[in-house]
Amino acid sequence: MIPVLLVTICLAVFPFQGSSIILESGNINDYEIVYPKKVAVLPTGAMNSAHPCYDPVTCQPKEKEDCESGPCCDNCKFLKEGTICKMARGDNMHDYCNGKTCDCPRNPYKGEHDPMEWPAPAKGSVLM
């Protein structure tokens, strides 16, 4: 398939800014913003609404933002250490955020082969 080139700004169309979005698969969610010396991959569905973790002009993560999504991410910040991110079921134990990642780490005090460990520990997206 021939890539389609659209001229637009990160999340909205403005005539004064000329960033390029390349749709390689024809799917609006599979795209990259191309700059002279850098490429920013935007979150899935970013074309539909402005993402609060990204600068709408530069399409880059905002300064001092930790994460984009995940069970231990809220408003682009890691949740504080000790916040429950996965409730216990049965005799199981809660999983807690560690304040350093957007993922929900497995409680280290759980048994090695926990029958309640489904689905797998939840993952999120960290901003780099």
Swiss-Prot record:
It is found in: Secreted. It comes from the Eukaryota. GO terms for molecular function: toxin activity. Residues 1-20 form the signal peptide. One of its GO terms (cellular component) is extracellular region. Residues 26-112 form the Disintegrin domain. Expressed by the venom gland. Pfam families: Disintegrin. Transmembrane segments: none annotated. A motif (Cell attachment site) lies at residues 89-91. Keywords: Cell adhesion impairing toxin, Disulfide bond, Hemostasis impairing toxin, Platelet aggregation inhibiting toxin, Secreted, Signal, Toxin. Disulfide bonds join C53-C59, C67-C76, C72-C97, C73-C102, C85-C104. InterPro entries: Disintegrin_CS, Disintegrin_dom, Disintegrin_dom_sf. The keyword Signal applies. Monomer. Belongs to the disintegrin family. Short disintegrin subfamily. This is Disintegrin ocellatusin. It comes from Echis ocellatus (Ocellated saw-scaled viper).
